Amino acid sequence: MSEEVQSDVKRFLDRLDERVAERLAAQGTEPSWIAARRQAGAARFEALGFPHRRIEEWKYTDVRAIARGDFRLATDADFSPATAARLTLPVEAHRLTFVDGVFAPALSRLDDLPGGVQLVPLSRALEENHEAVGGPLGRLTGVEFSPFAALNTAFMEEGAVLRLAPGTVVEKPIILQFLSRAGEAPVMSHPRILLEMAGRSQATVIEHHVGEEQAANFTNLVEEIILDRGAILTHYKLQEAPLGDLHVASIHIEQARDSRYTSFNLNLGGGLVRNDLVAELNGQGAETHFNGLFYGQGRQHVDNHTLVNHNAPHTFSHENYKGILDDRAHGVFNGKVIVKRDSQKIEAEQSNANLLLSDRAEIDTKPELEIYADDVKCAHGATTGQLDEEAVFALRTRGIDAQTARGLLTLAFAGEVLEQVDLDAIAERVELAVAGKLPERFNLAGLVETAAALNEE
């Protein structure tokens, strides 16, 4: 490890020492298992350092903007209520809100939770019954997974815990909102999310990352999702962070028999974004659906790595990721499916399609299949291209000008993912965001109206 890298690592570990000292001075000792895991995370991070491009899984993503950053840790959750209202999704929901990683009770809504649902900030869950949290926390995403997972474990202090009792059906969505502030100095946060759904429970969770336009912070999230037999979860991750923000997320899902997990990974913001999404299909009848849409412009960098492990027979996975890249944006997609030995009668389908709106935009895509069973149905594919000029011409013959035609085709490309979204507020928000990012700067209302009229014909 070079002296420069050692210096970067030391700067983060110094921040950790400062934070631990502050916490101990304010609260006294912490449970021994928390201290042990924190130390393990710090030791692993110190040994690994930040990932570099000589590592295969990071060969297209440069994290020096994170490594060289001098990030502080937030100590309060002050945020303009008016700004928060403007940024919040217009969805009737239960909501936990965090500002730069600090729980914001004034911006949360927990007063009408139904029976069978526990939704609390991680800090409160640890205070009330830390032993109940200690078992599952870190079981799926340990310090060995990546340097960022180790760093998150070292700094672990806040996040969300969501537990559903057997047979519980939550009618309203649950929103986990993460707000990023524009301050005098950049800050970092390391939220930890633990979601446990007992048998036959059902919920929709919206994870929303958004913030003030001039914010330039670092979010390093770890999320562990455990679905018991027959549990059903729809998980929206809407990432609209400011372009100055840096965002890393590690999400692990463990699925028991007959459970179903549906993910919508929607990335519109952030200057540097890395998502790792891993599903473990451990019981027969388990289903995983990965849907993704990312839009990059300027010099945005968006990297999506997905992994589905078919660990049991009669399991099913479907993946559809689409990327739209403009200017000098860079996208990365690495989707991997592993079919374990004796996992017969599985079905796995994977697709990645990318649309380049600029000659300088770049995509690196790598779909992978590893199959160690012989009675399976598997398919994968990736395509990259520009808008179909024949389709543009066809729209122009209907009286639509060239710029609007290109905008409509781009929206249609995104729409193949968005039409699967059941929540209109999210689908419409993403659709308008995509239209607003298009290079021609269309009249948004007119463009959407034209698209709607064509759909009705």
What name fits each language-model region?
Residues 2-150, 320:
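N-terminal amphipathic, basic helical "cap/leader" segment at the start of enzyme domains
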